[in-house]
Amino acid sequence: MEEEKHHTEHVPEWKKDEIENIMELIQSHKVFGMVGIEGILATKIQKIRRDLKDVAVLKVSRNSLTERALNQLGESIPEMNKYLDKQTALVFTNESPFKLYKVLEQTKTPSPIKGGAIAPADIIVQKGPTSFPPGPILGELQSAGIPASIDAGKVAVKETKVVCKAGEVVSQKLATMLTKLEIYPLIVGLDLRAVYDNGAIYEPELLAIDESQYFSDITRAAQSAFNLAVNTAYPTSATIGTLLAKAFAESKNLGVNAVVFDSGVMDALLAKAHVQMTSVASEAADKDANAVDDQLREVLGAAASAAAAVAKEPEKKEEVKEEEEEEEEEDHSEEDGMAGLGSLFG
């Protein structure tokens, strides 16, 4: 106990304040994450901090002090210590882990690579002209392994070439030429390692989602849930309107088929009875013209006229279509004729 007290007394005050500050930031935000800042210039970090000010707080501290702060907070928070490696910063926000990931990805920008650095991916120089006039630059490009020549008064890359494969060391000559060609192989920004949210730890792989696909999946799931609820007659605020409309249509159909005399179906019953009546009367009149009276004969005549008018409608449309086609053919013929005259007279 004495040894622990003695050790605590020798911790500098600024370290205690730093640990307290980290703990307060974690406790005052819903979410915090660890990001790698290795290779990022101080000026770039300052710019990122300004860009994030409306969404998140970025704090750079010593790994040892961050570790102490996490350990003192307890619960599952100390599990974040395994993501402390090399140069690390903390980021605090009240947004969701997914929003934080998206915002941090937007901080990444292409950056030149230095000589002696490892290529993160294949570095490719594309075929095509450059902005350089003929001069010493031609030999410099060639000595760096870039196939260059003179074309139309400009230095040009003769063919597309992989000048450095992923994992290989980039030479100083090549690094210089890549920068001159404005080829920036590095993507520099805050590299999210993990996010802590209410006891759960999310790694980048879980947060990198395709938003359009995600939205499509949710929409499809919502539609399937709606259909299931309607087909199982499960009432909710979203389905009650459809369920009532479906129930009304089914009850009306039942009333008509069962011939239930109700104010809600009387119009449909009368219309159905009228159709049945004219059908029977028509068959009777076909067998014996005197089987129907004058009034019923007028009804049958009106029905026959209406049916004939409906049957003629498609014929009229067909005639109009044929006339339009003939007019188009005439127009084309005139155009062809004019074109022919044009060719004759140059």
UniProtKB/Swiss-Prot annotation:
Gene Ontology BP terms: cytoplasmic translation; ribosomal large subunit assembly
Compositionally biased residues, Acidic residues: 321-337
InterPro entries assigned: Ribosomal_protein_uL10 (IPR050323), Ribosomal_uL10 (IPR001790), Ribosomal_uL10-like_insert (IPR040637), Ribosomal_uL10-like_insert_sf (IPR043164), Ribosomal_uL10-like_sf (IPR043141), Ribosomal_uL10_arc (IPR022909)
Residue ranges, annotated region (Disordered): 307-346
CDD domains: Ribosomal_P0_L10e
Keywords: Ribonucleoprotein, Ribosomal protein, RNA-binding, rRNA-binding
GO cellular component, one term: cytosolic large ribosomal subunit
Annotated GO MF terms: large ribosomal subunit rRNA binding; structural constituent of ribosome
SUPFAM superfamilies: Ribosomal protein L10-like
Function: Forms part of the ribosomal stalk, playing a central role in the interaction of the ribosome with GTP-bound translation factors.
Subunit structure: Part of the 50S ribosomal subunit. Forms part of the ribosomal stalk which helps the ribosome interact with GTP-bound translation factors. Forms both a pentameric L10(L12)2(L12)2 and heptameric L10(L12)2(L12)2(L12)2 complex, where L10 forms an elongated spine to which the L12 dimers bind in a sequential fashion. The proportion of heptameric complexes increases during cell growth.
Family membership: Belongs to the universal ribosomal protein uL10 family.
NCBIfam families given in the database record: PRK04019.1-5 (NF003098)
Name of the protein in question: Large ribosomal subunit protein uL10
Species for this entry: Methanosarcina barkeri (strain Fusaro / DSM 804)
Lineage per the UniProt record: Archaea, Methanobacteriati, Methanobacteriota, Stenosarchaea group, Methanomicrobia
